[in-house]
Amino acid sequence: MELNGIKPADGAKHYKRRVGRGIGSGIGKTAGRGHKGQKSRAGGYHKVGFEGGQMPMQRRLPKRGFKSQLLKFNAEVTLSALEQLGASEVDLVTLKQAGLVGELAKVVKVIMTGKISKAVKLTGIGATAAAKVAIEAAGGSLA
């Protein structure tokens, strides 16, 4: 082996194909775009969903349902998040300061995900039936 004989392994390098650089390259002149037509031109392609002037699928199908704007005021907190919080008394302000709920949250509910071992007193916060049982079993309460 000599320094002038070192080269990358076969298939290790993929060189960028230079198109439009003469007939001898095998991919000159039209550069793989064919002849004429929209797709052969610079900037020539349709919008996503364009079906050649036919009424597109997205407009043929009926509208359905709606997204409630009230959902942005609702938030969920898990039992494991309450465990990590480490506070003995928790209310909406505490959760916002800890970053567990968003600033817009007005209604918060504790859900049964994870475990809780510390006693936590919740004020102004709801809980699912299973989460309520788990909180009370750990010595906590809901007010």
UniProtKB/Swiss-Prot annotation:
> For this protein, what is any one GO molecular function term?
rRNA binding
> Where does this protein have coiled-coil stretches?
none
Where are stretches of biased composition, namely Gly residues? 21-31
The cross-references to Pfam families, in alphabetical order and at most eight, read:
Ribosomal_L27A
Query: InterPro entries, per this entry?
Result: Ribosomal_uL15, Ribosomal_uL15/eL18, Ribosomal_uL15/eL18_sf, Ribosomal_uL15_bac-type
Q: Which domain of life does the protein's organism represent?
A: Bacteria
Q: Per the UniProt entry, what are the Gene Ontology biological process annotations, in alphabetical order?
A: translation
Q: Under which name does UniProt file this protein?
A: Large ribosomal subunit protein uL15
Q: Which organism is it from?
A: Albidiferax ferrireducens (strain ATCC BAA-621 / DSM 15236 / T118) (Rhodoferax ferrireducens)
